[in-house]
Every structure is written in structure tokens, then in C-alpha cells.
Amino acid sequence: MKKRPQRLVFIDETGTTTKMTRLRGRARRGQRLKMKAPFGHWGTQTFIAALRHDGLTAPWVIDCPMNRRIFEVYVETQLAPTLKPGDMVILDNLSSHKSEKAAAILKQRGAWFLFLPPYSPDLNPIEMAFSKLKAHLRKAKARTIEALWQAVGSICDLYSPDECWNYLKDAGYVAD
């Protein structure tokens, strides 16, 4: 696959919350850093997307944790329309991902699943893309569900083809 990285599609999910705030800050020497941080009730969502060599595709935010039924809906409504014959969908080895219905949907499109070994996030370059997503979400300070969804939507457009290509290269999927 190092010769045809344009056929690789990496998917994963990550959690997003309305309490995300910057992890670091600056203050003058001798002064204490003061920054507002949310306290109390917050909303948690699951963000799932696909990373290709030229961009982030099929983004989806749901207001609950991922399970097999929701994963099947994601594959059918969001991911499958973006796939081409010969695409290989690479994902982590979660039990909710091992769905015969989702595999059949991909087979109809001429694509297939390839599961990563357990506990190997370094083999999934979308983890690097999620790091950027979370940094931008912290900066956006979205405190409502609607604001979080809008922030995620605008951040998804920030991934350039060169950046996505470098994610694949850093994970070892592109030959020099």
C-alpha cells in the first residue's frame, strides 16, 4: 500500500466536550497565570471522521458513545458515499467496529476493512489529526453543544492535502 496511499482511509473516533480549555498559558515573570476554566455540568460528544491522503472526510458528531449500531449508521450514511472501489478502510480493533453489516456495506462499494493490532494508535495517522482538532477546540472555547458542532465543522476545513499526506508519511504509510 506504500505505492498507493490514495486508497487508504483511516477512521477513528475521539471524545469532545464543552469544557475543553487550553492546557498551557503565559504570564509575566513573577505573576500568576489567570485563565477561566469551566466548572460544573458539561456536554460530551463523540466525533468520528476519516482521514485520506488529501483531507479529512466523513466527519460526524454524535451525542452519545460509539456502539455497533451507531457505527453501522455512520458507515452507511457518512463513510460509504465517500468511498471508491479499491479503498481500504483502516481502523482500530474495537468490538463495535466488527460489524458484518458495515463490512457488507463496504463490500458493495468495492472497499474493505483492515483492523489494526490492539493498542497501536501510532499506526493510525488520524490520531495526529485529532491532536490538531482538540488544540483548535480548546482555543475556540465552545461552551454549548451547538457551538461545539460549529467549531468542529470549521476546523475540519483546516486540514490541507500536504498536511494529511505528512500524517500518512509520519505513520509509515508513504514511501520516500
Regions found by a protein language model. Give the residues of each.
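Short functional hotspots at interaction and active-site rims
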Residues: 1-176
